[in-house]
Structures are given as C-alpha cells and as structure tokens.
Amino acid sequence: MVKIRLTRGGAKKRPFYHIIVTDVRSARDGRNIERLGYYNPVAQGAEPRVVLDTARVDHWVGNGAQLTDKVRNLYREAKSQAAAA
C-alpha cells in the first residue's frame, strides 16, 4: 500500500518535514517514491508554512494512495491557500 506522509528533517528543536509518497513498509526517513512538497511548522514572517503540489496529491489519491491525518489537514490548508491566492 502507498501512503502520503511526512518525513522529518531540519535541526534539533527546529523541525522541517517533507511531504512524500512512500510504501507503508519503508522507514519514516527511508526510501520514497516522490516528494510532493514540504511543511515548516516553525515558519516566521513571510516564509510559507505549507508548500504542496495539490495536482500530484490528487493524482496519487486517484491511484489508491492514502493520506495520513496530518497530511490530510495540510492538504486542506494548501488548497484553501491556493483558492485565496
């Protein structure tokens, strides 16, 4: 099964997450199929908090990929940002 989930990066006490497509059997920071965007929970000022290729997310969901709960919330946030822009 394929999932769209977060993989952690960044420094200690300063997390940064990539939103990726991966097989559920892969480790959290292991092999991925495609990188769809990123999530910066500590963004400040004009830095974007979520950058996500919603067209590719729709493609993967159409092919049977499942989103984790956090990625589903980020996807909604990215779609609302795109609609507002």
Swiss-Prot record:
Record InterPro entries: Ribosomal_bS16, Ribosomal_bS16_CS, Ribosomal_bS16_dom_sf
GO molecular function list: structural constituent of ribosome
GO annotation (BP), single: translation
Entry superkingdom: Bacteria
Cellular component annotations (GO), alphabetically ordered: cytoplasm; small ribosomal subunit
Keywords: Ribonucleoprotein, Ribosomal protein
Family from the record: Belongs to the bacterial ribosomal protein bS16 family.
Descriptive protein name: Small ribosomal subunit protein bS16
